Amino acid sequence: KQKALVKDLLGKGFETEFHSNCKALHLDVPLQFKITGAEGTTNRQLGFQAIANLPPSHVLSEGEQTAVALADFLTEVKLNKSSVGIVFDDPVTSMDHMRKEVIAKRLVEEAKIRQVLIFTHDIVFTQYLTSAAIEANVNFLGRTISRPGDGAPGWVDLDAFPHPHYEKEAMGVANQCLQE
């Protein structure tokens, strides 16, 4: 019964929503879900439509794998129906600047529905988030977390975003990437 229920739930929009998220993240790969498991357990496995038994990790780059995981997560969040906040820790690791931009836009779209907290060291991604939020008329509040070199706990710096000691250099790098 559990396996049938999971198949039914997948049939009621999970796969459609997942592919919609993949499209929003510029992932153009023929992926499909397979339901496996023994009695009492059910697993959802992601695979390629045309290639049996070849795991996506053998074909997709690390950045693409991360984007697939993000698409899967955002699909689960949407189908959950409870509008709870979500937290991301550096969601664009191993991504090129083009993928960072589409992820920023997708997360800003999610911020129209629920609170989205993003921790990142990536100034280019931060710039994409800021621009996407302004364009979508979504409230954006950036903060810098500072930490002294003596091992003491860090603090949220309410006055600096991004932090003044690297702002000029980081914005130059961000603008250069935006022009590419």
Show where each model-derived region lies.
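A structural signal for short, well-ordered beta-strand segments and their strand-loop junctions
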Residues: Q32, V87, I118-T120
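Conserved P-loop NTPase "ATPase switch" module shared by AAA+ and STAND
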Residues: G85-S94
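Extended helical coiled-coil dimerization/tether regions that scaffold
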Residues: K1-V59, T75-S82
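C-terminal lobe/lid and adjacent interdomain/linker elements of RecA-like ASCE P-loop ATPase modules
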Residues: V102-E180
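Conserved D-loop-proximal element of ABC-family nucleotide-binding domains
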Residues: S94-H97, E101
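GG-anchored amphipathic helix commonly corresponding to the ABC/SMC/Rad50 NBD signature/C-loop
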Residues: E62-I86
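Conserved RecA-like P-loop NTPase ATPase core
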Residues: C22, V68, F119
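Generic, well-ordered alpha-helical scaffold segments in large soluble proteins
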Residues: N21-L25, A71-F73, V77, S94, ...
